[in-house]
């Protein structure tokens, strides 16, 4: 049985990361295993920024967003010498295994450490839901709720002034936040990463709505895919459609806030599952949610998986949300 494990959060923060930390600490404690938190992700691993965690410390973080341990990006971790320093720090502290919470980039580091003798388990922590080997990532539900609430508020004011609004949403190349928000808010026009509309197409569709007498429009777009700002997209749509068109960039508000009950549940139980696997002497695994059940897969296999093709659903939803009658 292992005696000490470490835990770190890497990449962009996501609501629910603290619940995963709590799940690891409480489960490990029940098995007599000590847990050390690594501050600021892989950077803390290389610099030896370790702190001993206990159950009492986790009680105050269950309802908090962000990550108690802090997070930082370290591209240099792909270099062997940097990883060797990290492994030396772990061995010096007597840490035999590691739980890594983050996205795809974090898992590559975890796989390399496993190959160097430190068993690692990866948990999917990102609001983007861009990891193919899990139905939902930790943080996705909370971010979605935050976005939907914001779009509902935007709808109120657009309706009052007969305007359209272009809402830019995060996703890191994955359109799930856009598509799910379109379902939840009835957005008339939406352009997720998987099936982008051109600005001309969005403008012409908006023009059709205006000619039918629709008072307001919500237009959702995935971030960083048009090469211009949301304000510039709005200006172009306004010229084509005739709607007075505003732009809203939700930005980092999507990452913050208290995690929803579902994110807390997914994160905590994933942390429990990770400790159980490490206690069995297993490593190089990724914990994902599949059909409402936690599963463990080899990290290598998860990195090559492709997400389900959502284009048929997106096209069907466009027809439904795009229909308007008085």
Curated annotation (Swiss-Prot):
How its function is modulated: the record gives: Allosterically activated by ADP and other diphosphonucleosides, and allosterically inhibited by phosphoenolpyruvate.
Binding site residues for substrate: 126-128, 163, 170-172, 223, 246, 252-255
Pathway(s) this gene product operates in, as recorded in its UniProt entry? Carbohydrate degradation; glycolysis; D-glyceraldehyde 3-phosphate and glycerone phosphate from D-glucose: step 3/4
Determine if Kinase is one of this entry's keywords. yes
Q: Where found? A: Cytoplasm
Under InterPro entries, the record lists: ATP_PFK, ATP_PFK_prok-type, PFKA_ATP_prok, Phosphofructokinase_CS, Phosphofructokinase_dom, PKF_sf
Binding locations of ATP: 12, 73-74, 103-106
Name the EC number(s). 2.7.1.11
Q: Which residues form the active site?
A: 128 (proton acceptor)
User: Would I find NAD among this entry's keywords?
Assistant: no
Which GO BP terms apply?
canonical glycolysis; fructose 1,6-bisphosphate metabolic process; fructose 6-phosphate metabolic process
Q: Name one Pfam family in it.
A: PFK
Which metal ions or organic cofactors does this protein require, according to UniProt? Mg(2+)
Q: Where does ADP bind?
A: 155, 186-188, 214-216
Where does the chain bind Mg(2+)? 104
GO MF annotations in UniProt: 6-phosphofructokinase activity; AMP binding; ATP binding; fructose-6-phosphate binding; identical protein binding; metal ion binding; monosaccharide binding
Q: Which reaction does it catalyse?
A: beta-D-fructose 6-phosphate + ATP = beta-D-fructose 1,6-bisphosphate + ADP + H(+)
**Quick one: a GO cellular component term?**
6-phosphofructokinase complex
Describe its partners and assembly state.
Homotetramer.
Explain the purpose of this protein: Catalyzes the phosphorylation of D-fructose 6-phosphate to fructose 1,6-bisphosphate by ATP, the first committing step of glycolysis.
User: What name does UniProt use for this protein?
Assistant: ATP-dependent 6-phosphofructokinase
Organism field: Mycoplasma capricolum subsp. capricolum (strain California kid / ATCC 27343 / NCTC 10154)
- Gene for this protein? pfkA
């Amino acid at each position: 049985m292992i005696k000490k494990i470490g835990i770190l959060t890497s990449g962009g923060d996501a609501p629910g990361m603290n619940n995963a930390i709590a799940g690891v600490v409480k489960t490990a404690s029940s098995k007599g295993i000590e847990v050390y938190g690594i501050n600021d992700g892989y950077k803390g691993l290389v610099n030896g920024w370790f702190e001993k965690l206990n159950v009492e410390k986790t009680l105050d973080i269950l309802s908090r967003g962000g990550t108690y341990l802090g997070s930082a990006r370290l591209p240099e971790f792909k270099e062997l010498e940097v990883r060797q320093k990290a492994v030396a720090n772990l061995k010096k502290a007597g840490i035999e295994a590691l739980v890594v919470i983050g996205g795809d980039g974090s898992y590559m580091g975890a796989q390399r450490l496993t190959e160097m003798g430190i068993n690692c388990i990866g948990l999917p922590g990102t609001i983007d839901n861009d990891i193919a080997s899990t139905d939902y990532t930790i943080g996705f539900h909370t971010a979605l709720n935050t976005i939907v609430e914001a779009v509902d508020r935007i709808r109120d004011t657009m309706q009052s002034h007969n305007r359209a609004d272009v809402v830019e949403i995060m996703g890191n190349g994955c359109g799930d936040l856009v598509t799910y928000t379109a379902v939840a808010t009835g957005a008339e026009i939406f352009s997720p990463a998987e099936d982008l509309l051109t600005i001309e197409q969005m403008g012409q569709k908006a023009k059709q709505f205006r000619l039918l007498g629709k008072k307001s429009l919500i237009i959702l777009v995935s971030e960083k895919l048009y090469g211009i700002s949301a304000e510039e997209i709005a200006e172009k749509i306004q010229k084509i459609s005739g709607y007075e068109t505003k732009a809203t960039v939700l930005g980092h508000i999507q990452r913050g806030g208290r995690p929803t009950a579902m994110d807390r549940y997914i994160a905590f139980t994933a942390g429990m599952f990770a400790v159980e696997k490490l206690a069995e002497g297993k490593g190089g695994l990724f914990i994902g949610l599949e059909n409402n059940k936690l599963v463990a897969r080899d990290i290598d296999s998860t990195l090559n998986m492709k997400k389900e093709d959502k284009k048929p659903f997106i096209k069907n939803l466009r027809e439904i949300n795009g229909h308007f009658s008085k």
